[in-house]
Amino acid sequence: MPQIGLVSAVNLRVQGNSAYLWSSRSSLGTDSQDGCSQRNSLCFGGSDSMSHRLKIRNPHSITRRLAKDFRPLKVVCIDYPRPELDNTVNYLEAAFLSSSFRSSPRPTKPLEIVIAGAGLGGLSTAKYLADAGHKPILLEARDVLGGKVAAWKDDDGDWYETGLHIFFGAYPNMQNLFGELGINDRLQWKEHSMIFAMPNKPGEFSRFDFPEALPAPLNGILAILKNNEMLTWPEKVKFAIGLLPAMLGGQSYVEAQDGISVKDWMRKQGVPDRVTDEVFIAMSKALNFINPDELSMQCILIALNRFLQEKHGSKMAFLDGNPPERLCMPIVEHIESKGGQVRLNSRIKKIELNEDGSVKCFILNDGSTIEGDAFVFATPVDIFKLLLPEDWKEIPYFQKLEKLVGVPVINVHIWFDRKLKNTSDNLLFSRSPLLSVYADMSVTCKEYYDPNKSMLELVFAPAEEWVSRSDSEIIDATMKELAKLFPDEISADQSKAKILKYHVVKTPRSVYKTVPGCEPCRLLQRSPVEGFYLAGDYTKQKYLASMEGAVLSGKLCAQAIVQDYELLVGRSQRKLAETSVV
């Protein structure tokens, strides 16, 4: 992962002007005769600015020469090969679940399943039901796919997104989904490092580099031990001792930590507060948009468990373009190719019940009704709670939802009039009190690539006190924080880099707020109401409130429906018989 715009072989504190390069890590030094590498190249379709080809005979000699002349690259855009994920236990487990839908007996009467919400949970549910031979009808309230990964195109043709979405190696169901759709090449894998800004040293960063040659957890342990800028050796030792119970206790220990906050758990384990301040404020905000005094320790341990036990678990990839087109549309096309339907602008007004309390139909805003053999709600938990029928509110299963509340988050996009130098081809942890993670999307993402101007996408969190404020106030506050990250290039008054335009996307209720005591409130996908199911990252599954959790929840929801096939067919037949008698 290049830091401050440089490949790791170069002195990271030296900055200067030079050309931008974009290549594949696996193809360096293997250029074809026309100047483009045979596997990946500088030339990307769909952008005039990507049509120029550079012949790079030896990139490593270039970096050595630049270091000597103090004219290093601003950033070397390098996409790394897809890591070897396919033989990991979690990937194979996810692959087996996927294959169970394709190999299940074809239904004599395919079920029509009405699904509310075309986020990743709803799309996943529909995709795997279609694989099992059923006919999903997926309804999306808005005119855009994706839910929490939605994005929009402005009048200039530029995209702005709901969030800054990172695809980890520790996302086995998501990685399987990309493979099943044949779009693995749409993930741009970055160098296996985590880069943290140094608040006390404006403009400087500290790295955790995971060595490729070592297996997990040794690669992660060495990455921590080699970093001497954020933690002292005594702090590392105390932190390691504090983590021992989690490493030895396994999943049962992790689940038992749901009731304690990150900050309280660290103190209980004798871990210095400075470790929490230096590392876990940034990690907590990245995982759930809140600080460690609020976040459940279970959330952190789930992430650490994946990152430390899987060699490529913490390796990160960016999608090569906007999520609705590059990820969601392939899922929709797959669903429709198997006879399913996806309908936009289909907002649900009411869940209409039968006399026995089961679902009769969904009533849409336009007054139309949608009936089916089964019904799924795959919306965010707050939307489902708003539409929860009165007759269901006394059912203990649904009463558990009361504690689950979405956390507010803001995603900020700023287009600058110049290319920023103090950036990197990867995700960056700002360690700012107002900002969480950020990236220069003009570098990390092919569709957003711009050789002349930077576009920073930043997660503004915690956002509870800011979500009701004006966009201009949020931008002003963001610029003050960016002035610390880019002291030579950005000032709050724009006397340096100037803003060309910006977009602020507010999500008042995003993923559920993972405070202590929430785990028992996460519901199984099969509800006690016959024929009604739930999907979404807030439902019961072993991953965080994340894209991976949403995809897995959809698979588990589809699995429950397939398992209930005979029951649902019998229910439909009874309903048909009752209608005939009337």
Curated annotation (Swiss-Prot):
It comes from the Eukaryota. Pfam families: Amino_oxidase (PF01593). GO terms for molecular function: phytoene dehydrogenase activity. Gene3D superfamilies: FAD/NAD(P)-binding domain. Its main location: plastid. GO terms for cellular component: chloroplast; chromoplast; membrane. Its cofactor is FAD. Substrate binds at R306, A545. Its EC number is 1.3.5.5. Inhibited by the herbicides metflurazon, difunone, fluridone and diflufenican. Signal peptide: none annotated. Pathway: Carotenoid biosynthesis; lycopene biosynthesis. It is an enzyme of class 1 (oxidoreductase). FAD binds at E140, A141, K148, H165, I166, Y171, I348, D537, M547. It catalyses: 2 a plastoquinone + 15-cis-phytoene = 9,9',15-tri-cis-zeta-carotene + 2 a plastoquinol. It is a peripheral membrane protein. Keywords: Carotenoid biosynthesis, Chloroplast, Chromoplast, Herbicide resistance, Membrane, Oxidoreductase, Plastid, Transit peptide. Residues 1-110 form a transit peptide. The keyword Transit peptide applies. PANTHER family: 15-CIS-PHYTOENE DESATURASE, CHLOROPLASTIC_CHROMOPLASTIC, PROTOPORPHYRINOGEN OXIDASE. Belongs to the carotenoid/retinoid oxidoreductase family. Homotetramer. This is 15-cis-phytoene desaturase, chloroplastic/chromoplastic. It comes from Capsicum annuum (Capsicum pepper). The lineage of its organism: Eukaryota, Viridiplantae, Streptophyta, Embryophyta, Tracheophyta. The gene is PDS.
